[in-house]
Each structure stands twice: as C-alpha cells, then as structure tokens.
Amino acid sequence: MTSAMKKIQPEAFSEKSSDSQASVSGAKSSSFYIGMRVLPPAEREAMYAIYNFCRQVDDIADDLEGSQEERKQALDAWRHDINALYAGEPCGQAAFLKEPVARFHLRQEDFIAVIDGMAMDLKGPIVFPDEATLDLYCDRVASAVGRLSVYVFGMDPNIGESLAYHLGRALQLTNILRDIDEDAEIGRCYLPREPLEKAGIPLDIEKALADPRLDKVCRDLAWQAEGHYAASDHIIHNRPKGYLIAPRLMAAAYSALLRKMLAQGWKNPRKKVKHNKLALLWTLLRLKVTS
C-alpha cells in the first residue's frame, strides 16, 4: 500500500487516448473519479495527469516481480525526467506533465517528494516504522499529492498547503487502517512502532495482527486521522477560494469509511470496509447544492 491517490481508485476509467490518459486507471464510481468530473476541463485534465504520474511511480514500487535494483533504476529515471522537465530539457516519460506544470505552476519538489515516498517502500517492506518515519511517508505519498492538487484547484498556496497537510495524512492513515491485512500479505505493516511497544504487542506481523490489544492501537491511530479530518473540515468550511468540491468529497467519503471502521473495530478476524457508491453520489449532490 503506497500512494493515497492510487488507493482511492480501484477500477479503470479512460476519458481519451492522450498521453496523459494512456496509463491512467481508476474508478468511474470512485470518490476520486466523481470528484474530478466536477472540475472544469483544464483542471480535470491536470488532475488526471497528476494521477497518471502517481500511478506510474506507485506501480514501480509495487512491482514485486521486478528486482529492487530494476525498480530503483525506474524511479531514478522518473526523478531524472522530472528534473529535466523543470530545466527545460527533453523530459522523456514526464512530457505529459509539461502543460499542467506550466499552467498551474506545480512545484518540482512535490513531484520529487512523491518519488521519494515510493522509494521508501522500495528499500524493503515497511514494517512497524517509528512515528516520525510514518509521518514522513504520509507526507511524501499523500500530502505531496495534495500540494500538487491544491494548485490545480486554484487555492491560496498557504491555505492549500495546510489543507494538503491534514487531508493527505487523514486519507493515508485511513488507507493504512483499512488495508492492514492486505498489506500483511506482502510483508508490510505501516502501524507505528511506539504504540505497539507501549501496548506490549510483539513486533511480528502475524502475532501483532492476531493480538486483541491491536484494536486499541488502531483506534488511537484512527483518532489521529479524525483530528486531521477535523482540521481539513475547518479549512474547507471557511470557504477559501478554489474548486473545493473535490477535496470536500474526498474528505466526506473517507471520513465516513473511517467511522465504519471505528464502529466495526480491528479485532481479528477483520472485515474490510468499502465505499457505498450510492452514498458517494448522494454526497456529491449534497455538496453541489451547498457549494
């Protein structure tokens, strides 16, 4: 489990056959797809391009059939092409980002941060990171994507970056809590080390996931995510300038998912919670009426 943006769309969509769309896949019924559809064309295409980039580098990190060196080289190639793009040089696979970068003044360091986040997964399965490492990971694979997005949404940079900070972490923590068992199957566990040790839970994936004390650790992490959702809601409810339906929908959809998990708990055996598609559409209609 890596980028929040990738996790937000599990199925396939395709708007057209342009380079920026060629490898994009997502869900026509997902919160990402629904949220992006309400944007004006230029903003929508820019978001699809950002997603395309995220999807490609995320797939490199998740390609468990490729060797570590092959995947490292692939991420290094992306890093080279992003740097070339901003230097005005031939930029290879990053060429589809030229227009959104120029139009919306997207920052080089945010693209690089996403790549660096994928590289964290590449160094070996992330297992029980310390809290500082987990926060850095969330910043790179989720909040950095948010920082790119808020420029497309036309938000004030300071307000937008604050929204990206909180909403990115909220979404990523929600994904981590949702995908505990799925991640464990590939030898990963993103739950932070310190609360597990404090609870006396062994730092062994199989033992930790079967431990009844895990429920409280997960609930505490869920409340951290709730705090980030609350901070995001506070920013959005102040009605800053920009196209806010997309982040509002993401926040509404994923905070609802988190509430479902809190109601269900994390005691073994766990049942993975999913989005309610009709509820997503209803939320979109409600947000359009109140925007």
From Swiss-Prot:
One of its GO terms (molecular function) is geranylgeranyl diphosphate synthase activity. Keywords: Transferase. GO terms for biological process: carotenoid biosynthetic process. It is an enzyme of class 2 (transferase). InterPro entries: Isoprenoid_synthase_dom_sf, SQ_synth_HpnD-like, Squ/phyt_synthse, Squalene/phytoene_synthase_CS, Trans_IPPS_bact-type, Trans_IPPS_HH. Gene3D superfamilies: Farnesyl Diphosphate Synthase. Residues 1-23 are annotated as: Disordered. Pathway: Secondary metabolite biosynthesis; hopanoid biosynthesis. Its EC number is 2.5.1.103. It catalyses: 2 (2E,6E)-farnesyl diphosphate = presqualene diphosphate + diphosphate. Pfam families: SQS_PSY. The keyword Transport does not apply. Involved in the biosynthesis of the hopanoid precursor squalene (SQ) from farnesyl diphosphate (FPP). Catalyzes the first step, the formation of presqualene diphosphate (PSPP) from two molecules of FPP. Belongs to the phytoene/squalene synthase family. HpnD subfamily. This is Presqualene diphosphate synthase. It comes from Zymomonas mobilis subsp. mobilis (strain ATCC 31821 / ZM4 / CP4). The gene is hpnD.
